[in-house]
Structures are given as structure tokens and as C-alpha cells.
Amino acid sequence: AGGHTIQDDEPKYGLCVTGFVNPASMWKNIGAETGDVLILTKPLGTGILSTAVKGEMASEEETAYAASVMATLNRYARDKVVDLQVHACTDVTGFGLAGHALEMAKGSGKTLCISLGSLPIMKGALDSASMGFIPAGAYRNREFAGGECEFSWKNHSGESSENFWLEKTRCEAVENETGRSETIINEAELAAREDIVFDPQTSGGLL
């Protein structure tokens, strides 16, 4: 269940979908447990790319790619994990990854650790963010959630008063287990990735 909060000058139309669900089969945005792995099913950046499109600064390829991602149903991701034990799930939409992850963390009484370097990001979104194509909703999301997110250069020690911990490097434990090489990210890209964390998503994925 969900909805949209819209504040702009463009006309919109709305739809309503109703149905039935078995309460025992519902996934809620609370209930995350210590040791759970976070899976993000779609790349981030729709709000930033949409802003770039309105500014006529996005390429045809970037525009088509963003549209294809938004048109992809979450049903396919759901079907891949429906037989697994999912403790918590949320969509990533208007409040951005930060807002929805924070809601999950608070509701579960846990701290979520997310590596900025590991986040999937749409083609062109980093460049568009670096050029300043940040939607107004991203600033509101940062104002709402930014004070409860902690950005750190170091790996999370497991002890934090924050609900949401964002690392500026990949999680060391993940690197050691998978054998993947370290990703080096410069300051400009880090700033753009921080903006994308707060970017409001249209037809975003699941977390």
C-alpha cells in the first residue's frame, strides 16, 4: 500500500488499485534483523535524470534507459525472492533511499549500513547530479532524513547512535568475502552519490 505526495504546477491523474492479500504473506517495512543482507532491486537516479530531461541536458540514451527502468515492474524482483525468508521490505520512492531506509531502520530498531560505492546508479545520474540537476524533493528528503544519517569514511563498527549509516567506501567484510577489488571514488563523485541517496524515485525498486 502507498501513495504519492505531489507539489508542482503540472497536471496529474491518479489511479487506485484494490485487492486482497493473505496477512501471513505480507512483507512489512519493519522487522529487519541483525545480519540481514540489504538488496536494492533497481538503480537509483530517476528524480535527478528527470530533472536533467526537463532541462534538456539528458541524452536520448539516458532518457530511454531511465524510462525502461521506471517501466520495469517490481513483480519480477519479488518473484525471485518470494521463497526466501524476507524479514522486511519497502519500496524506494518519493522519500528516496535515505528516507525509506530510515523508516525501516527506526521501525525495526536497527542500524542499516549501506556502502555508497556499492549502490546501483542509473547511467547519467552521477554526471547530472554533479551538474546540479537536483530535484526540490531531494532537498526536502535531506532535510527530513539527513540529520539521522551518518556519513563516514570508515567501515561501521557496529556501534552508532544513528539509525542509518552510509559508508563512503565499500564494506570491507563484503570485499574480503567476495574477493572484489576496492573501488576508488573521488570527492566529486562522493558528493553526487550523497545527493542520489536523497533523490526521490519514480517507480523505484524494492529494498
Segments (PLM) and residue ranges:
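Helix-biased detector of long, well-ordered alpha-helical tracts
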Residues: 1-207
